């Protein structure tokens, strides 16, 4: 799953403290649905997903994006036990929702893109490396039920 150094943890935690979970969550999930349209099939109940502007303005997309990033915030508090932290969510997404685990990787990559947009020069290659390690670890933890 990857080992987080103290520097990784400090880097991730420091940036996370500046993230607007509602804005970044909505943008991250919205971008996932626009860039990878096949992921929309898991969100049939969200109403109008017919265009990029409809998706980005959809209140259900924003609300679920916030929920996703809120759970990521919990993970940041437990970087040494991502698998345990996400055990229930992994079970839900695997057994009940049947989400393709590849989508977790895509979402993590979209989040890294959103953070880069929001934080600009502050999102250095070192910061990106720590965050990429984290989203990869989270994707792996969420996929653990599938193995």
From Swiss-Prot:
Q: Name one Pfam family in it.
A: Globin
Q: What does this protein do?
A: Gamma chains make up the fetal hemoglobin F, in combination with alpha chains.
Q: Which residues carry this modification: S-nitrosocysteine?
A: 94
| Modified residues annotated as N-acetylglycine in this record | 2
Consequence of substituting residue 147 to Y: In Onoda; O(2) affinity up
- Disulfide connectivity for this sequence is none
Residues where Phosphoserine is found: 45, 51, 53, 140, 143-144
Domain named Globin: residues: 3-147
Result for mutant: residue 131 to G: In Poole; unstable
- Tell me the protein's name: Hemoglobin subunit gamma-2
Modification after translation (UniProt):
Acetylation of Gly-2 converts Hb F to the minor Hb F1.
Q: What is the effect of changing residue 106 to H?
A: In TNCY; hemoglobin F-Brugine/Feldkirch; lowered affinity for oxygen
For the modification N6-acetyllysine, the affected residues are 60, 83
**Which consequence is recorded for altering residue 39 to P?**
In Bonheiden; causes severe hereditary hemolytic anemia
Q: Which family does it belong to?
A: Belongs to the globin family.
Subunit structure of this chain's protein: Heterotetramer of two alpha chains and two gamma chains in fetal hemoglobin (Hb F).
Residues given in the record as heme b binding sites: 64, 93
Location of Phosphothreonine modifications? 13
What SUPFAM superfamilies does UniProt report for this protein, alphabetically? Globin-like (SSF46458)
Give one GO biological process term.
Answer: cellular oxidant detoxification
